[in-house]
């Protein structure tokens, strides 16, 4: 189990055999690779300063498979105060193009659209962001690990 709380929850359910606290592999990986990610350009690649932008990721079906969801995404992107970096997942871009909304996204002021980035480059962007807007549980968790709201 990743935490003592998880072990305690199992104990209360009567499950104790073979249960051990081993930590969270995602946390361990995030901490292991953070120093390596710190060597990447991060926000400087977009002419931005650490803490001076919002990072956005969106790719899940619930956020991209209906026109209403896509229009909501466009509205959120337009409402973010200040610079925003949005590495666009191919699925998300395809859905925005299909809905005829991609051109509108490209016109949003202070929005830096980028192709998808690898883990280390993404971590460099994440750790230096002022805030994160995402539909990804993994990104939410990593933002928490790095004290990004």
Predicted regions and their residues:
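Alpha-helix N-cap/helix-start capping motif
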Residues: 4, 24, 90, 136-137
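A nucleotide-sugar donor-handling region in carbohydrate enzymes
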Residues: 1-68
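A donor-sugar binding/catalytic signature common to diverse glycosyltransferases
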Residues: 122-149
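A short helix->loop->beta-strand "cap" motif at the edges of active sites that frequently abuts
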Residues: 16, 82, 148
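Phosphate- and divalent-cation-binding pockets in alpha/beta enzyme and binding domains
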Residues: 9, 29, 94-96, 142
């Amino acid at each position: 189990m990743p935490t003592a709380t998880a072990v305690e929850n199992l104990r209360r359910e009567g499950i104790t055999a073979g249960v051990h606290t081993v930590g969270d592999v995602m946390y361990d990986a995030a901490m292991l690779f953070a120093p390596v990610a710190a060597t990447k350009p991060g926000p400087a690649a977009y002419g931005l300063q650490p803490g001076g932008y919002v990072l956005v990721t969106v790719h899940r079906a619930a956020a991209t498979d209906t026109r209403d969801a896509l229009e909501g995404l466009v509205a959120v992107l337009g409402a973010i105060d200040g610079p925003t970096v949005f590495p666009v997942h191919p699925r998300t871009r395809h859905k925005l193009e299909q809905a005829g909304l991609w051109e509108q996204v490209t016109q949003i002021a202070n929005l830096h659209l980028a192709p998808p980035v690898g883990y280390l480059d993404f971590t460099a962007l994440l750790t230096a962001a002022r805030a994160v807007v995402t539909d990804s549980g993994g990104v939410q968790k990593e933002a928490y690990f790095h004290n990004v709201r």
